[in-house]
């Protein structure tokens, strides 16, 4: 039997079993349990430096700093993925609010990526309508008013 698949208006990626622990639900609601969001990074922090700093808490699978596409400069945040959820939790407890490269960093569990839904709700521009379609529409509107 499955537990609630939709809570608070948000769909969960997978569903916990009823007899499983509550941490299963919260892990899935947050996103990936072994991936951490790191905010407040210095612009001089590198992916290698981030990986080395967080490797004190466990095996770092990936360290990523998000870059601006235009300027190719750090946006000041990134992600660190650990081999296990326990290592990620240890890093969260140890690094949140601490200094790294002269800046206070903020650590939290990464959230699942949200779908943008095809351009934010704006229609796709397809050019002017075909004249035949306009004529057919006018003919239909005229016949309805008769």
From Swiss-Prot:
One cellular component (GO) term of this entry: chloroplast
Transit peptide residues according to the UniProt entry: 1-31
Source superkingdom: Eukaryota
A Gene Ontology molecular function term of the record: RNA binding
Tissue: Expressed in rosette leaves, cauline leaves, stems and flowers.
RRM domain span: 34-112
Triggers of expression: Induced by methyl viologen.
Subcellular location per the Swiss-Prot or TrEMBL entry: Plastid, Chloroplast
Residues annotated with Phosphoserine modification: 42
Principal subcellular localization: plastid
GO biological process, one term: positive regulation of response to salt stress
Gene null: resulting phenotype: No visible phenotype under normal growth conditions, but mutant plants exhibit increased sensitivity to salt stress.
Keyword Plastid (UniProt): yes
UniProt keyword list: Chloroplast, Phosphoprotein, Plastid, RNA-binding, Stress response, Transit peptide
Physiological role: Probable RNA-binding protein that may be involved in salt and oxidative stress tolerance.
The name this protein goes by in its record: Small RNA-binding protein 11, chloroplastic
Annotated organism of origin: Arabidopsis thaliana
Gene: S-RBP11
